[in-house]
Amino acid sequence: MTLLGSEHSLLIRRKFRSVLQLRLQQRRTQEQLANQGLIPPLKGPTEFHDPRKQLDSAKTEDSLRRKGRNRSDRASLVTMHILQASTAERSIPTAQMKLKRARLADDLNEKIALRPGPLELVEKNILPMDSSVKEAIKGTEVSLSKAADAFAFEDDSSRDGLSPDQARSEDPQGSTGSTPDIKSTEAPLDTIQDLTPGSESDKNDAASQPGNQSDPGKQVLGPLSTPIPVHTAVKSKSLGDSKNRHKKPKDPKPKVKKLKYHQYIPPDQKAEKSPPPMDSAYARLLQQQQLFLQLQILSQQQQQQQQQQQQQQQQQQQQQRFSYPGMHQTHLKEPNEQMARNPNPSSTPLSNTPLSPVKNSISGQTGVSSLKPGPLPPNLDDLKVSELRQQLRIRGLPVSGTKTALVDRLRPFQDCAGNPVPNFGDITTVTFPVTPNTLPSYQSSPTGFYHFGSTSSSPPISPASSDLSAAGSLPDTFTDASPGFGLHASPVPACTDESLLSSLNGGSGPSEPDGLDSEKDKMLVEKQKVINQLTWKLRQEQRQVEELRMQLQKQKSSCSDQKPLPFLATTIKQEDVSSCPFAPQQASGKGQGHSSDSPPPACETAQLLPHCVESSGQTHVLSSTFLSPQCSPQHSPLGGLKSPQHISLPPSPNNHYFLASSSGAQRENHGVSSPSSSQGCAQMTGLQSSDKVGPTFSIPSPTFSKSSSAVSDITQPPSYEDAVKQQMTRSQQMDELLDVLIESGEMPADAREDHSCLQKIPKIPGSSCSPTAIPPKPSASFEQASSGGQMAFDHYANDSDEHLEVLLNSHSPIGKVSDVTLLKIGSEEPPFDSIMDGFPGKAAEDLFSAHELLPGPLSPMHAQLSPPSVDSSGLQLSFTESPWETMEWLDLTPPSSTPGFSNLTSSGPSIFNIDFLDVTDLNLNSPMDLHLQQW
């Protein structure tokens, strides 16, 4: 039966009470307690308390006495370190300690005195000796051992502090032997003197001492005649004993003096004993070396600082020779000098950093070698070794050897004092294709080798082309070396010879020394090798271009029967031709390489391009229209465009900027002969978008204008058959034009063919060429149109190769920037957006579908077609995005063209990707592989 909590507590309380009651009943009364003595009686007398107190005091006394008896005496406390011994008591153990030490010392001395001498050790075969010595010892055994001990202890007092020589002079027995005998003993005694320091290492070195003394014993006994051995042996033993006797007080100092560098010193002793060894000759020598090196470093730095200004002046002169606009060599020079200025006391070579933009010397000299060597004094013998070494170091010669060797090395330089001597190890590689703005990319790597960016590097390029590749590094721009170029002279004032000379001069001086022509000849030979390599590469490229041209011509003949591209493609193709004068020669050759599989229009444009470039030997050789990713449009030919919208184009690495120019502007600009460098090039490319012409797309046919007529033209694109017809006529005309160009090898100065091509270009619906122009409003009808576009693409699949040829020639990374004078974007684009908005839905979708046909094949290179102005709202193609970053352009390939185009803004930048190589429809893979290999 379980109890509730309250009931349980009640039970406990009751039990507790009952227990309390029992205890109260059973407890003793006070009387009982008082009787038992537990409490004082209630009314009792004081006698009860007194005895109790006495008892307590007696107890404490007893306990104290007990403790006093048991406590330990003082001696035990002192031994237990509980108490300190008093001064009186402390003197006793100290005296005892002294006595004990004295006793130990006496014992030691006795043991040392009684220890076996060298002769005994020899007799007992403890020490190895020659047989002759043993025989001599056996002959004089008894007398020797006894006399030795006697002499040792008699002479000890007089010979305590004496060296062996002094002991020998004092020894009364010294005169007994004949003079030759005495002389013969002297050498062994000298050896004793030499050996004694080694024997002093420890007072307890009983084992080592006999050994050290036995050697003198041997050496003494060997040469002596029989009467003398006793005397010499006694002397050696007495000397050893005297040393050992008095070794104890001298202990600390000899140990320090005998410190050997290979001995191990425990860390607790190092701090105390490290200073004494530093006084040794070796330490002083180290300090001298350090000071000498510091002096060398300081003198080198001073020399470099003094010569810096001279070098800067010289390099400014060289800079004028190079005539590279906007290239400040001092920027290159300063970091190089800082590298060279790093003090390099040892003769390890630092690779010379090039002090002139074109020169890179692979030199085996030390860091100071880049300095201009000063004049040598007439008397080389007067120079110190350090100065001689410094002069040798400046001249890149070996620094090791005696002073005479150093002087001999410097003698040849006395004749041509003050003239820098080219280093024997220098291989100066002159890379001609350095454009003023590409030079930064050429600053030599620490190894001192140039990385030739492109195998197709070419002779010095014209300033215009250098402008094109403004910020681009040569590795990315194929600009300068196009097969068309060959090695023809370029407008750059610095001819190859001058650049060679200036590169030879490097940073050393404005002019090379007249002496040591052999050095120059070596350098020139090296440079000639480089030039030969470059020319060989160019010839190879030319051969490839010729092969590609042949293939293209064959394809032209085969493709002439095929249907021309849809109107969109055809217009772009013709535009490529028109813009071709602006395309680089390289681009032409390489573009053809890309388009080798493509139909005739492409080949035509490809051939046009090289010739156009060649014809413009002037700054028009904007061969570097292919802007490397580092190129900024400002330096690019586009930068020269008159229209601000074009100038504002953000740079995209591989985008070839095709700014659409109005047809009139194109006609004006296509004249390749225009001498202006960058602007002329831009005009050549038809990139000039004249604001006067209005926001017209640069299609020579009726351009997009804000007027309603232009809108109606755009909304009603030509039918497919018309486009095909126009394509046929255009291809024929392009063939004729290319024939003329091939025969003449140049573009005609008036570039009538270009104008004719431009005029014949049919109107491109605004969106056809520029993905940017597409209004972002795809509808179901748009999808239908896109499907129709895909059908057209099937028709156009064969011809698309032609179209791609043209586009790739113009857009290939080889640099055909201006091949398509497509859409003049900029101020025109906002009106174009409004125009697109004004289109009926069907027309706009037609535009989309037609447009989608192009972007697929054109994909990445299409970027060149429409460089959008920053202002354009619809054109989100930011050139700032590198094509490698935006990999979405594959969405624009024909099969998926419709969805790809719905994302205009996102896919826009991606259009510029060079990844089009992945597109199977484009037969570009083999030619592009060539270009990528050359890259």
UniProtKB/Swiss-Prot annotation:
The SAP domain is annotated at 380-414
Q: Where is the composition biased (Basic residues)?
A: 244-261
Q: Residue ranges of region Disordered?
A: 37-73, 155-283, 337-378, 498-518, 579-605, 654-731
Q: Name one GO biological process term.
A: positive regulation of miRNA transcription
Q: Which residues form a coiled coil?
A: 287-322, 519-563
Q: Where is the composition biased (Low complexity)?
A: 342-357, 695-709
Quote the annotated effect of residue 812 to D.
Answer: No effect on SRF activation. Impairs SRF activation, reduces interaction with EP300 and SM-promoter activation
Instruction: Give the chief site where it resides.
Output: nucleus
Q: How is it modified after translation?
A: Ubiquitinated; by STUB1/CHIP at the C-terminus, leading to its degradation by the proteasome. Phosphorylation by GSK3B is required for STUB1/CHIP-mediated ubiquitination. Phosphorylation negatively regulates transcriptional activity. Phosphorylated; by GSK3B.
Residues recorded as bearing Phosphoserine in the entry:
454, 458, 462, 466, 624, 628, 632, 636, 812, 859, 866
Q: Name one GO molecular function term.
A: histone acetyltransferase binding
* Localization in the cell: Nucleus speckle
Q: In which tissues is it expressed?
A: Expressed in smooth muscle cell-containing tissues. Expressed in the heart. Expressed in the aorta and bladder. Weakly expression in the lung, testis and kidney. Weakly expressed in the stomach. Weakly expressed in the intestine and colon.
Residues where Phosphothreonine is found: 893
Query: Could you name the domain of life of the organism this protein comes from?
Result: Eukaryota
Q: Where is the composition biased (Basic and acidic residues)?
A: 46-73
User: PROSITE patterns, from UniProt?
Assistant: RPEL, SAP
- Motif (MEF2C-binding) spans which residues? 12-27
Annotated effect of mutating residue 859 to A? No effect on SRF activation; No effect on SRF activation. No effect on SRF activation, on interaction with EP300 and on SM-promoter activation
Enumerate the UniProt keywords alphabetically.
Answer: Activator, Coiled coil, Nucleus, Phosphoprotein, Repeat, Transcription, Transcription regulation, Ubl conjugation
Q: Where are the RPEL repeats?
A: 18-43, 62-87, 106-131
**Pfam families (UniProt xref):** RPEL (PF02755), SAP (PF02037)
Record's domain comment?
The C-terminal region contains a general transcription activation domain. The N-terminal region, comprising a basic and a Gln-rich domain, confers transcriptional potency and specificity by mediating association with the MADS box of SRF. The basic domain may be required for nuclear localization. The SAP domain is important for transactivation and ternary complex formation.
In UniProt terms, what function does this protein have?
A: Smooth muscle cells (SM) and cardiac muscle cells-specific transcriptional factor which uses the canonical single or multiple CArG boxes DNA sequence. Acts as a cofactor of serum response factor (SRF) with the potential to modulate SRF-target genes. Plays a crucial role in cardiogenesis, urinary bladder development, and differentiation of the smooth muscle cell lineage (myogenesis). Positively regulates the transcription of genes involved in vascular smooth muscle contraction.
Q: What is this protein called?
A: Myocardin
